[in-house]
From Swiss-Prot:
Belongs to the UPF0102 family. This is UPF0102 protein Smed_3545. It comes from the Bacteria. Pfam families: UPF0102. NCBIfam families: PRK12497.1-5. PANTHER family: UPF0102 PROTEIN YRAN. One of its GO terms (molecular function) is nucleic acid binding.
Length: 122
């Protein structure tokens, strides 16, 4: 019984996270970004969204929280290191990597509000 509840909670959290990522992607598209990848995984880490506008690559961490501050502070230094490591792997696989600039952003997704995009967050 307890394992079933735990599994249900994990599934609910996973669905909430995926929905938050799609809302964040829509926010970025409306701001003029092109979504290059979602949930990009390497053995070193994962990037929720990789978005591009011109020669700028934004590696975006999406956090679904009740408040903007909660979302920002939820990105730990360990998570930042993993995102940076994964972004280096992604960047090295791009043919035009030499002309691309990289930036790390956070999109905070809060209930009943439009997602907030914090550029150059870390």
């Amino acid at each position: 019984m307890k394992a079933e509840r735990s599994d249900d909670l994990k599934l609910k959290a996973l669905k909430r996270g995926h929905l938050a990522e799609y809302r964040a992607a829509l926010c970025l598209i409306l701001k003029g970004y092109r979504i290059v990848a979602m949930r990009y995984r390497t053995r070193l880490g994962e990037i929720d969204i990789i978005a591009r506008r011109g020669d700028l690559i934004a590696c975006v961490e999406v956090k679904a929280r009740r408040s903007f501050d909660d979302a920002i502070f939820a990105v730990s230094s360990t998570a930042q290191r993993r995102i940076r490591a994964a972004s280096e792997v992604w960047l090295s696989r791009q043919g035009d990597f030499h002309r691309l600039s990289l930036r790390y952003d956070i999109v905070a997704v809060m209930p009943w509000r439009w997602p907030r995009h914090l550029t150059d967050a870390f």
